[in-house]
Swiss-Prot record:
Other remarks in the entry: Plants overexpressing ZAT10 show growth retardation and enhanced tolerance to drought, salt, heat and osmotic stresses. Plants silencing ZAT10 show enhanced tolerance to salt and osmotic stresses.
Zn finger residue spans: C2H2-type: 80-102, 136-158
Alphabetized UniProt keyword annotations: Metal-binding, Nucleus, Repeat, Repressor, Transcription, Transcription regulation, Zinc, Zinc-finger
Entries under SUPFAM superfamilies matching the protein: beta-beta-alpha zinc fingers (SSF57667)
GO biological process: one example: cellular response to hypoxia
Subcellular location, principal: nucleus
Induction: By salt, cold and drought stresses. Down-regulated by gibberellin.
Keyword Metal-binding annotated: yes
Tissues where this protein is expressed: Expressed in roots, stems and leaves.
Protein name per Swiss-Prot or TrEMBL: Zinc finger protein ZAT10
Amino acid sequence: MALEALTSPRLASPIPPLFEDSSVFHGVEHWTKGKRSKRSRSDFHHQNLTEEEYLAFCLMLLARDNRQPPPPPAVEKLSYKCSVCDKTFSSYQALGGHKASHRKNLSQTLSGGGDDHSTSSATTTSAVTTGSGKSHVCTICNKSFPSGQALGGHKRCHYEGNNNINTSSVSNSEGAGSTSHVSSSHRGFDLNIPPIPEFSMVNGDDEVMSPMPAKKPRFDFPVKLQL
């Protein structure tokens, strides 16, 4: 309605006497600012303004307003601090990338060797915790890791070492079994095999002995005749 009022031929006509009178205009301006006077109020109410004219008048007052919008509130910059070297970073992603360098240096130190005391102290001082403040500790060698995935990969080393020990023991036991088998083969029999039943066999060249008692052999001597 305000645009129609501005473009209407009625408003295109010369300014009505209300706006020509500077005293009345300033009185209306004071009334809009909160400082009202009896004279301006009475002069303003004596004029018969339609709704469209009143809206056009309000638009003119708004166009003369020189106030600027308030500046936006300053965004508070959050700083993320490293718990190892006390460096600050603008974002959590930058802090995570910085902590990865600490973990890399720690792994290189552990792989390089050193006495147990220095290794344990380095592990305790440069132990990196997760965002929740919890650290994952190995129950076998008491090493701490920043995540559960790293701890799981570390425990595989322990499991693979145990498997190698088991395979070596199995190979040793197999070697012992083969040695016992060879020694038993040298003896001519195996204790794990039941014995074969023995039968009374006689050589083929010998005669079969009868169960009857043998007869006494007869000796024939030549008879000498005496003449």
